[in-house]
Every structure is written in C-alpha cells, then in structure tokens.
C-alpha cells in the first residue's frame, strides 16, 4: 500500500470511531433508534466521500510543525489531530449539503445530492445543521481541558461566518435566472473566493494544527494568513481556469461555470478587455444552458488570449508566494515547509 493510501486509511479509521462516539451521545439522550440511524446515514453519506485534502492537511501540518511525519504519530496524538481534520470535513459536509439545495445541484462526488436521496428532501436542511453541530460536540468531548479550546471554537465560528458571507455574495451576484454581467467584477470575484473558499480550505487546517502545536502568537497566525489567503485565491482562479479550459478527462468533471452564470475569474478577465461587439456576444450567450452558447463564449475566451493571461498570472503569483515563504520568521516554531507543501499541492495541478 502506498504511503498516501495508508495515510488516508488511517484517517478514515478515525472517522468510524467518531461516528460511533456521536451515535453513543444520541443513545445517552435516549434518542429513538430510527433517528440515530438517520443521523449515522447522513454522516456516512455526506462526510467521508471527497478527496479529504482539508482534513489530511491538518495532520500533515501538525507533523511538520512537530518535526515528524504523520505515520510516526502515536495513536493518542494521531486521533486528536485527525479529529480536528474531521471537524473541517464535517464543516465542508454542512456547507455542501446546504449549497447543493441552494444550487439545485443533481450530483455530488459521483452520487445523488443528499436532498435528492429518496425520503430526504427538505430534512436535508436540518441534517446540514446537525453536521455542523457535531463539530462542537466532538470538540467539547476531546479538547475541553486544553488551553487552546476557546481558540478552536473562535476559529471555527469565525471561519464558518466568513464562508457564509462569501456564499451570500456568490448567490446574489450570479443569479442563474437573470444574467447581468454588469454585476460582475474582479473585486467581487476576489471577495467571493477568499471568503467562500480560502479561509476554510487553506487557513483553517493550518491554524488548527498550529494551536494544537502550541504556536499561537498572532504574528505567526498573520504570517500564514498572509500567504494562505492569496494561495487559496490562486487555487480558485486555477479552478475557474480549468473549468473552462480543462478537459473532463483531465479535471474529472464537466465544467459548468459558463452555463451556470458563475462570476468566475475567466469571465471577469474577458469583460476587462472585450470590445463592445465581443461584450454583446457575452451578454447574449453567457449563462445560457445550451452547448452552442457555451461554445461561443469558450471560443471568444480563446480569441481574447485568456490562457496566456492565466499563465502569466500563475507565474507571477507563485514567484511572489515563494518569496514570501522564504522570508518567514521561524523563531517561534512556525515552519516554512508547511507553506511550501501547500504551494506544491496547488502549483501546476491539473484537477
């Protein structure tokens, strides 16, 4: 078994323990069996199915900060840090269950969205709340005695609210029914991706590992924030680029940003340089559900040289981030390797 697969298996084993713990808490409340089974089914359906990047990076970051590798952590230590990883995966599950209902999505991670599973429907709203609630039940059980317990709570509450702000701006900017490209701007795009993605996917995993490692100086949290937030923005810009220019075989999904009227980086770059005629073509075709309109937009993006603009942006942001990482002050226990590892996962990825 490869190291990567072994790390994933060990992480998944902890999830089984957590489901059992949550189940026992419901048993202690004298919850009827059918409700316990429902919650367990929701946990298993919605939480462990993705790539688990966010959760695993808490473990990897903790290991780097403690001069070791994740496979060398003893079981007690491993379970505790993996629990923080699973808390992010529960947060992600909570967002996705709700997000899929808001977007009326059909599938998620290769299976029907939870609200479309037979018999679930609007109960999925309450299920999403329970996935979030599970985070705090688990944190209380495992971290109540730790000096950084309140820091963990603050961090989860703040990042959750930031993500919801990003989601709000996304929803009111990109209405699937009414296409209005005047609503789009690169400033809005930047706010959406930083708040909706960068905080919980990039900053949160590292900040959690730092608190657990006793690295809690605001100077250090700021050092990582100043790198991970732009890195998260770059990650999402890359995602927008791949949605339009990547092939389904390459990215593992069919890009839908154009048809969904998304306020993506690609359309915003096009709007900056389009002639009035080209703008008219975008007004007439962007956000339309048919393949022909989508293709017209894609052809125009190619014609406008968006690919080169992206590659130039990528090289400049990566050079800037590398320089920032080089200048990190490691005197209080922070390690450059943490940030180098994150950058390595994002730079030149193809899916």
Curated annotation (Swiss-Prot):
Pathway given for this chain reads: Isoprenoid biosynthesis; farnesyl diphosphate biosynthesis; farnesyl diphosphate from geranyl diphosphate and isopentenyl diphosphate: step 1/1; Isoprenoid biosynthesis; geranyl diphosphate biosynthesis; geranyl diphosphate from dimethylallyl diphosphate and isopentenyl diphosphate: step 1/1
Q: Where are the transmembrane segments?
A: none
Q: Give a yes or no for keyword Lipid biosynthesis in this entry.
A: yes
Cofactor note from UniProt? Answer: Binds 2 Mg(2+) ions per subunit.
Binding, isopentenyl diphosphate: 51, 54, 92, 109
Q: Name one GO biological process term.
A: farnesyl diphosphate biosynthetic process
Which cysteines form disulfides?
none
Which EC number(s) are documented for this chain?
2.5.1.10, 2.5.1.1
Q: Which residues bind Mg(2+) 2?
A: 99, 103
- Keyword Transferase present in the record's keywords: the answer is yes
Query: Can you tell me which family this protein belongs to?
Result: Belongs to the FPP/GGPP synthase family.
Q: What is this protein called?
A: Farnesyl pyrophosphate synthase
The protein's gene is named ERG20
């Amino acid at each position: 078994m490869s190291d990567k697969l072994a790390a994933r298996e060990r992480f998944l084993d902890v999830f089984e323990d957590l489901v059992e713990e949550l189940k026992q808490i419901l048993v202690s409340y004298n919850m009827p069996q059918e409700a316990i089974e429902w919650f367990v089914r929701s946990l298993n359906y919605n939480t462990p199915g993705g790539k688990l990047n966010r959760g695993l990076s808490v473990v990897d970051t903790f290991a780097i900060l403690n001069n070791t590798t994740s496979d060398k952590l003893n079981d007690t230590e491993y379970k505790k840090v993996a629990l923080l990883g699973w808390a992010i995966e529960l947060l992600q599950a909570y967002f996705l269950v709700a997000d899929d209902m808001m977007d009326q999505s059909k599938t998620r991670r290769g299976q029907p969205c939870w609200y479309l599973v037979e018999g679930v429907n609007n109960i999925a709203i309450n299920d999403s709340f329970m996935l979030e609630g599970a985070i705090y039940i688990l944190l209380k059980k495992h971290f109540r005695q730790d000096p950084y317990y309140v820091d963990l709570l603050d961090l989860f509450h703040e990042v959750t609210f930031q993500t919801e702000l990003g989601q709000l701006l996304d929803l009111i900017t990109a209405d699937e029914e009414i296409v209005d490209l005047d609503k789009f701007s690169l400033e809005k795009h930047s706010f959406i991706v930083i708040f909706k993605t960068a905080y919980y996917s990039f900053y949160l995993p590292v900040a959690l590992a730092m608190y657990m490692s006793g690295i809690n100086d605001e100077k250090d949290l700021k050092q990582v924030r100043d790198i991970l937030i732009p890195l998260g923005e770059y990650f999402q810009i890359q995602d927008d680029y791949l949605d339009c220019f990547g092939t389904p075989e390459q990215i593992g999904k069919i890009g839908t940003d154009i048809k969904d009227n998304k306020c993506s980086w690609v359309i915003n770059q096009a709007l900056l340089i389009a002639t009035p005629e080209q703008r008219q073509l975008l007004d007439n075709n962007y956000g339309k559900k048919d393949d022909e309109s989508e293709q017209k937009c894609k052809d125009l993006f190619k014609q406008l040289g968006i690919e080169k603009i992206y590659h130039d942006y990528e090289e400049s942001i990566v050079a800037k981030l590398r320089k920032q990482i080089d200048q990190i002050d490691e005197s209080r226990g922070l390690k450059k390797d943490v940030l180098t590892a994150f950058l390595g996962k994002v730079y030149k990825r193809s899916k």
